[in-house]
């Protein structure tokens, strides 16, 4: 991670799981909460992040990458559909990075499904709002799990790699993941931020 980092600590509460770790004077907190434990629609979770300066120094630009591994039943990959601001969809099956720094490439939701011709399993990602402000990533990376997981933050896609192809030459497996990149802004000395 950084020059000065800690191991991740986990705390399981009655309604969430909290992971905490530190890097270079910043303490990060990830909270995963089931969205509605009484719902028949199991598996909907809320993921939030917080950062706090713990060494008396400020941080000008804190960014976070959230990598999510997609498994749909026994299938370890998804065909992704990115919702766009103009109400169209972009199907993604090859490694790519989408620049959303202007907020125009992504309309706060994406989904993946097992079969583009006859979907039977679907997974969704919807960005929430904090204090009436939509929290959207400035960048989204889609890739083969092996390639995306081997990068810590920056990701160089192999645009010729189709991650839904079990016979791709690089990994000989179909496997996908995606990463959402968030700008958490600046953090004042001993201050906090969240996403």
Spans of features found by a protein language model:
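Acidic-aromatic substrate-binding/catalytic surfaces of carbohydrate-active enzymes
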Residues: 1-9
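Amphipathic hydrophobic-ligand
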Residues: 26-31
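Beta-strand-rich recognition/accessory modules
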Residues: 16, 22-24, 40-46, 58, ...
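Active-site/ligand-binding surface loops and adjacent short beta/alpha elements
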Residues: 86-137
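A eukaryote-biased signal for short, well-structured alpha-helical docking elements
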Residues: 8-17
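Hydrophobic beta-strand positions in extracellular immunoglobulin-like domains
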Residues: 32-34, 51
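Acidic (Asp/Glu-rich), glycine- and aromatic
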Residues: 40-108
């Amino acid at each position: 991670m950084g020059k000065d980092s800690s191991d991740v600590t986990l705390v399981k509460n009655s309604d969430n799981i909290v992971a905490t770790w530190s890097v270079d004077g910043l303490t990060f907190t990830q909270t995963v909460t089931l969205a509605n434990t009484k719902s028949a629609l199991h598996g909907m979770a809320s993921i939030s992040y917080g950062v706090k300066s713990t060494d008396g120094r400020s941080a000008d630009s804190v960014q976070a990458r959230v990598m999510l591994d997609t498994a749909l039943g026994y299938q370890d990959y998804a065909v992704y559909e990115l919702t766009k601001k103009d109400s169209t969809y972009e199907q993604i099956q090859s490694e790519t990075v989408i620049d959303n720094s202007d907020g125009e490439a992504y309309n706060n939701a994406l989904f993946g499904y097992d079969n583009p011709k006859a979907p039977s399993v679907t997974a969704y990602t919807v960005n929430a709002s904090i204090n009436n402000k939509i929290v959207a990533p400035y960048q989204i990376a889609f890739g083969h799990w092996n390639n995306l997981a081997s990068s810590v933050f920056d990701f160089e896609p192999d645009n010729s790699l189709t991650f839904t192809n079990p016979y791709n030459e690089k990994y000989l497996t179909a496997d996908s993941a995606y990463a959402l990149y968030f700008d958490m802004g600046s953090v004042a000395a001993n201050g906090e931020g969240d996403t």
